[in-house]
C-alpha cells in the first residue's frame, strides 16, 4: 500500500504584507506559463481565439495569469477575484504598470460569494487556490455556480508529496534562492496540497466531468467543460 504524508492544512488566506511582497516578486513564470499554455490549447477554448469571452480566475493572487491572458487574448473580458486585500492591491499595481488596468478587473470575493454573477463565465480558472481551502467543495461548487453551460474549466495546484523529505527536495529544487518566507510558504503549501486521488474523488463528488492528471513533478491539472 502506497504511503502518503498526512495533509496539514494551512491558513486560508496568504495576505500578510511580507508574504504578498515575496509572492509578487517571486518567479512563477514557469508554472504560470504552463497554466496559460494548457488553457489556450484546450479544444473547447480554441473556439474563443478571436471571439469575446468572459473569464474569471478564482484566487487570482497578484494577477500574473490574468495579465498574461489579457496580453494574448485582447478580445476577452477578464476578471480576477481573491479574498486577500493586499494581494489584490499588488494585482492592481501590476495591471497599472502594464497599462492593463482597463483590460483586467480585480475584485474582492470570499468564496462562496453570491454577489458574483451566476452561470456567467465561459471560462472558469483557478491556480493554487484549492490547497488553501478548509473545504475543497467550496471551489468545485463555485465553479459550477459561476460557469455558463458548456463553460471551459481549468484548475491547477500542487500535489502533496509522499514525505516531508520529498517536500524538502522540491523546495530546494524550485525555491533554493527564494526568500525564507517564500520557502516556508512553499513547504507548507506542499504539505497542505491534495493528492491526485483526493482531487479525483472531490471532482466526482461534485458531479463534475473533469479529467485530472499529473502535469509536473509537483502539479496536477483538472480540465473539462460544465454540462449543466
What are these regions (language model features)?
Residues 147-152:
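Short glycine-dipeptide loop
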Residues 133-143:
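A short, conserved alpha-helix within the catalytic core of class I
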Residues 125:
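A conserved beta-strand element that flanks and buttresses the S-adenosyl-L-methionine
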Residues 51-61:
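Conserved class I S-adenosyl-L-methionine
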Residues 56, 64-113:
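Class I SAM-dependent methyltransferase SAM/SAH-binding core
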Residues 1-22:
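N-terminal, positively charged/glycine-rich alpha-helical extensions of SAM-dependent methyltransferases
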Residues 156-207, 211-214, 221:
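C-terminal alpha-helical "lid/dimerization" subdomain adjacent to the S-adenosyl-L-methionine
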Residues 29-51:
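Conserved alpha-helix/loop element of class I SAM-dependent methyltransferases that forms part
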Amino acid at each position: 500500500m502506497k504511503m502518503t504524508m498526512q495533509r496539514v492544512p494551512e491558513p486560508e488566506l496568504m495576505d500578510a504584507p511580507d508574504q504578498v511582497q515575496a509572492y509578487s516578486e517571486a518567479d512563477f513564470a514557469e508554472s504560470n506559463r504552463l497554466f496559460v499554455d494548457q488553457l489556450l490549447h484546450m479544444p473547447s477554448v480554441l473556439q474563443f481565439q478571436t471571439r469575446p469571452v468572459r473569464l474569471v480566475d478564482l484566487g487570482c493572487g497578484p494577477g500574473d495569469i490574468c495579465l498574461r491572458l489579457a496580453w494574448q487574448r485582447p478580445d476577452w473580458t477578464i476578471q480576477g477575484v481573491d479574498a486577500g486585500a493586499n494581494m489584490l492591491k499588488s494585482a492592481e499595481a501590476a495591471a497599472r504598470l502594464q497599462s492593463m488596468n482597463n483590460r483586467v478587473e480585480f475584485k474582492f470575493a470570499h468564496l462562496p460569494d453570491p454577489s458574483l454573477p451566476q452561470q456567467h463565465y465561459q471560462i472558469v480558472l483557478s491556480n493554487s487556490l484549492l490547497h488553501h481551502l478548509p473545504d475543497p467543495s467550496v471551489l468545485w461548487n463555485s465553479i459550477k455556480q459561476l460557469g455558463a453551460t458548456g463553460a471551459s474549466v481549468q484548475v491547477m495546484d500542487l500535489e502533496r508529496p509522499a514525505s516531508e523529505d520529498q517536500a524538502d527536495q522540491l523546495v530546494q529544487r524550485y525555491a533554493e534562492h527564494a526568500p525564507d518566507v517564500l520557502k516556508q510558504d512553499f513547504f507548507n503549501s506542499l504539505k497542505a496540497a491534495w493528492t491526485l486521488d483526493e482531487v479525483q474523488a472531490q471532482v466526482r463528488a461534485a458531479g463534475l466531468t473533469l479529467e485530472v492528471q499529473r502535469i509536473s513533478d509537483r502539479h496536477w491539472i483538472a480540465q473539462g467543460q460544465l454540462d449543466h
